[in-house]
Amino acid sequence: FMNIVTYATPGAFLADNQAYLRDHEVEAQLNLGNAVAHREEPCGPELLFGKVEEQGRAVLLFGYLVPWNLCLDDVAHSDSGVQAARELALWLKAQEIVVPGVNGRQVLCEAFLQVWGSAYELRIAMDAMVLRRLHAPLPKGGALRLAVPEDEEVAAPWIAAFQQEAGHRELPLEMAREKFQKRVEKGTLYLFETRAGTPVFMATVSRFLPHGKCISGVYTEPGSRGQGYCQEAMALLCQRLMGQGDEYVALFVDKTNPVSNRAYQKIGFEIVEDNCDYRLKEGT
């Protein structure tokens, strides 16, 4: 028998599941990050955190924040987690809570979607990776630095291009400029320059976790790809973050980009879990 438990606040979710979340920060980072950001807000249909229990033991954690996907965390890593995903789909339908999609391990997402019954598509299949010990490549003489307002004409088009390459909806340049400006204000956007001072790479520190940080928006200018800049830049960024006290650096990578993924592995990143992003098709 499975039982679904929901929480009054994201903070209560964090407290009740702290042991799992502490030991699996990288795998659970989407729910963990959202719960921390909205810790004291009251939960409801548009901000929902819970767990599915089997015989009093959590086998699946879930979180939903409008307008984002439902996120599933596989506590059990067994058939119990798969069955819990099915039970959760039935429960959400009974509560008339409609989600735009689901993120999590492929086996969980597919079990959920089969019960949900609507048409869906796989937007991207990813691996969650983590680096705890850096293997620095031989330096090429480039330099990593924080982006400054004067970089907007270079970096804003890159942000728009990254969105398109990653399969997201097209991002108008003006919106890309806004994203650039916010990241510069927060001090989260980094650029890598060649020895000649030419920017060729960018990455964003996008999620601050209790013991580490997550990097996203990794982009190398097309004309500079295949020359080792990404590998060196990522090594420098990880070195900087871990030098500031982080125990690890996390990253989601596209399964269909093995060249980049090998570059990450060469500097010490390891795959910890698969993560798929499924979207429900509108009108189904």
Short names for language-model regions:
Residues 117-123, 265-274:
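Conserved acetyl-CoA-binding loop of GNAT-fold acetyltransferases
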Residues 2-8, 21, 25, 33-95, ...:
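Conserved donor-binding loop and adjoining core beta-sheet/short helix segment
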Residues 96-105, 241-253:
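Conserved GNAT acetyl-CoA-binding A-motif
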Residues 103-109, 251-261, 278-283:
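Conserved beta-strand-loop-alpha-helix junction that forms the acyl-donor binding cleft
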Residues 63-68, 163, 167-168, 174-216:
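Acetyl-CoA-dependent GNAT
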Residues 1-30, 134-169:
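Short amphipathic alpha-helix that is part of the acyltransferase structural core
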Residues 66-141, 278:
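Acyl-donor-binding surface of acyltransferase catalytic domains
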